[in-house]
UniProtKB/Swiss-Prot annotation:
One of its GO terms (molecular function) is RNA binding. It is found in: Virion; Host nucleus, Host nucleoplasm; Host nucleus, Host nucleolus. This is Nucleoprotein. It comes from Berne virus. Its main location: virion.
Length: 160
């Protein structure tokens, strides 16, 4: 009947079913953020009920200072626990790590003909340059013009 009155009318089509999707926040935006605000939060009337703003600012500062102190103590405690055993000197530990890195290194196929002990020495020298941080030592052949150089090191330091 509608179509008779209105020649341009489209025959009745049900609206597509809308399935409720969970809200997707942009990355780094926590969903808990919305819950912290009181439901009557209205940005236009924000300054309605905060009394003396200066006093509240001082209180906030005091709270921050308390937290800071607590964190400092906790960090010192952790540092004391995490200290490496003093039985082995730092250089020895570094040498050990260098050995492990050297043996774990993978060498390109064109370097397989070099004596493995020499390769390990090269890798160890490279690993000794890494004092902190996890690193992968890639060993590649020297450039064509410098044949006397056995290998060049590219040391990637990966932050943990």
């Amino acid at each position: 009947m509608n179509s008779m009155l209105n020649p341009n009318a489209v025959p009745f089509q049900p609206s597509p079913q809308v399935v409720a999707l969970p809200m997707q926040y942009p990355s780094g935006f926590s969903s808990g953020y919305r819950r912290q605000r009181d439901p009557a939060f209205r940005p236009m009337f924000r300054r309605q009920n905060n009394g003396n703003q200066n006093r509240s600012r001082q209180n906030r500062q005091r709270l921050q200072n308390n937290n800071r102190g607590n964190n400092r103590n906790r960090n010192q405690f952790n540092r004391r626990q995490n200290q490496p055993s003093q039985s082995m000197s730092f250089e020895q530990q570094l040498l050990l790590m260098a050995n492990e890195t050297a043996y774990a290194a993978t060498y390109p196929s064109d370097m397989q003909n070099i004596a493995p002990t020499k390769l390990v020495k090269i890798a160890k020298r490279a690993a000794m340059q890494i004092v902190s941080g996890h690193a992968t030592v890639e060993i590649s052949n020297g450039t064509e013009d410098s044949n006397q150089r056995v290998a060049t090191f590219t040391i990637k330091v990966v932050m943990n």
